[in-house]
């Protein structure tokens, strides 16, 4: 988030792209016992992912220390805490944290409620949600970008540019979501087939994917709006809307 806030989103992108081959290498090596590493089977996937993130942490520390635009901030240097400066980060961070928790928790709760319907229903539901999370990456990315851009423009007292970015961001998110949903609708059998081969599983997964289409268009609008409000330093309203939408309605 610190790197993104400085507008260095490409640095963050390269770090996360680096995580993919690292994760593949450690997972493959520890699951099947390759390159002198022990064969751990399923648990090797968890250990491999943990090791990949540790390597990524080391790389990120090096970037923070060596990157010319990050080095002057001395992020890793120790200074005496200034408690007076904590108020604003907590005022913004706590509602955002509760917002994320509320959204993740409701989907986790739904997963638990699905348990009584049998393993095939759980698997189909999980497959549909997994692909929905992938589709949600587009509006979520636009939301994060709008938070950065809008806050920049507001800081420069440039309300006109901020409004232009807001309109452009929401429009882009809706268009991408619409194209994604059209593609998803006509390719449901292929997507379901990626997660299993049973005909009954594929048919049930297609039903869940159809339901997921209903809320993804709403996410295409809601996610950018959340990013916009955070750019205006308003984190309470997205939290209230999340609480009402996910836990009350």
Residue ranges of predicted features:
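Membrane-embedded alpha-helical transmembrane segments of multi-pass integral membrane proteins
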Residues: 26, 56-59, 219-222
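Small-residue-rich hydrophobic transmembrane alpha-helices
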Residues: 1-12, 111, 124-188, 219-233, ...
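Small-residue-enriched core segments of transmembrane alpha-helices in multipass membrane transport
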Residues: 16-23, 130-133, 210, 243-249
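Hydrophobic faces of transmembrane alpha-helices in multi-pass small-molecule transporters and flippases
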Residues: 10-17, 54, 59-62, 78-109, ...
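Hydrophobic transmembrane helix module of multi-pass membrane transport proteins
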Residues: 1-36, 47-51
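Helix-terminus/linker motif at the lipid-water interface of multi-pass membrane proteins
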Residues: 31-40, 101-134, 152-153, 190-199
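Short alpha-helical transmembrane segments in multi-pass integral membrane proteins
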Residues: 22, 37-94, 150-215
């Amino acid at each position: 988030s610190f790197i993104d806030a400085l507008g260095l989103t490409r640095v963050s992108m390269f770090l996360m792209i680096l995580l993919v081959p690292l994760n593949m290498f450690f997972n493959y090596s520890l699951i099947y016992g390759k390159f002198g590493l022990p064969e751990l089977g399923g648990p090797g996937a968890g250990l491999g992912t943990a090791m990949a993130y540790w390597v990524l942490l080391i790389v990120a520390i090096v970037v923070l220390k060596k990157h010319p635009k990050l080095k002057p901030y001395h992020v890793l240097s120790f200074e005496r805490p200034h408690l007076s400066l904590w108020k604003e980060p907590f005022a913004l961070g706590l509602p955002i944290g509760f917002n994320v928790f509320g959204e993740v928790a409701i989907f986790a709760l739904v997963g638990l409620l699905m348990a009584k319907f049998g393993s095939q229903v759980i698997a189909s539901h999980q497959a549909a949600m997994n692909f929905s999370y992938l589709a949600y990456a587009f509006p979520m990315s636009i939301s994060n970008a709008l938070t950065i851009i809008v806050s920049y423009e507001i800081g420069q007292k440039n309300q006109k540019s901020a409004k232009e970015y807001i309109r452009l961001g929401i429009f882009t998110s809706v268009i991408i979501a619409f194209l994604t949903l059209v593609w998803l609708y006509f390719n449901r059998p292929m997507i379901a087939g990626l997660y299993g081969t049973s005909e009954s599983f594929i048919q049930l997964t297609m039903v869940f994917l159809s339901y997921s289409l209903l809320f993804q268009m709403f996410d295409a609008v809601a996610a950018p709006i959340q990013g916009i409000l955070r750019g205006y330093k308003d984190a309470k309203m997205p939290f209230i809307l999340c609480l009402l939408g996910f836990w009350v309605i």
